[in-house]
């Protein structure tokens, strides 16, 4: 249990283009479907989660006001079309989040501190994170109970996970790290072999794999989680199973 009273789950990877936003939006929808009160905080200046949830890309006062000494998260929270899911939208001002965090005392604890006052409002906070390792990443990691790391099975992904592990080794109380296989094509022998090898290195990896799917690719056009427009397809079933697996880890 995190200091906020809600479980804080970050969709995070050093590497870009691995499906972080896809994962965050669909996990939010599946969690809400089971009765979990969800806040999705979009921390990526590209604002893809904000777009997918049909929310205006606006941070009032910009990132500087958000993380200022008297900044509060509650005024930035917006409802969405998905029952049980609220969002803190992103805009392009978040590209300077590192700069504004660096101006604060205890910058690595700032995001966790912003979450504390809304402790009783949500069961789950999902952080949709930009790629890379930065001061903002460190603040995200300090706020999270667990990092779900979408990982396309390959040798490069193994290296990315190793880099993340090396970084976390230097922290006093690092979050759990749960690799999640993303954009998986089971027909590819190389991917199957990569998963088998990575599972040996990362025994806490989530068992459910998210398939490479045209239904997932439609999210940008539909501006919605997959389950809302294609409830019976393989990808929806995978996100549903993945959420069940994560929920069991968070609350048991």
PLM region spans:
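P-loop NTP-binding core
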Residues: 1-252
């Amino acid at each position: 249990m995190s200091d906020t009273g809600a479980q804080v789950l970050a969709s995070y990877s050093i590497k870009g283009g691995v499906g972080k936003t896809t994962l965050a939006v669909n996990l939010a929808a599946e969690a809400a479907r089971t009765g979990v009160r969800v806040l999705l905080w979009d921390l990526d200046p590209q604002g893809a989660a904000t777009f997918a949830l049909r929310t205006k890309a606006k941070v009032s006062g910009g990132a500087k006001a958000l993380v200022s000494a008297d900044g509060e998260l509650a005024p930035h929270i917006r409802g969405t079309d998905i029952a049980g899911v609220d969002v803190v939208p992103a805009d392009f001002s978040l590209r300077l989040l590192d700069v504004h965090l660096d101006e604060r005392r205890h910058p690595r604890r700032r995001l966790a501190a912003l979450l504390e006052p809304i402790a009783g409002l949500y069961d789950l906070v999902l952080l949709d994170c930009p790629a890379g390792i930065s001061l903002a990443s460190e603040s995200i990691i300090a706020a999270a109970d667990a990092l779900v790391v979408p990982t396309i099975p390959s040798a490069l992904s193994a290296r990315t996970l190793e880099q993340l592990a090396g970084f976390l080794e230097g922290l006093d109380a690092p979050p759990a790290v749960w690799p999640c296989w993303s954009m998986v094509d089971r027909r590819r022998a190389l991917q199957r072999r990569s998963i088998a090898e990575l599972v040996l290195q990362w025994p806490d990896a989530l068992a459910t794999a998210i398939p490479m799917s045209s239904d997932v690719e439609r999210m940008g056009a539909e501006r919605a989680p997959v389950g809302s427009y294609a409830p019976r397809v393989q990808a929806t079933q995978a996100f549903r199973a993945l959420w069940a697996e994560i929920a069991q880890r968070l609350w048991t």
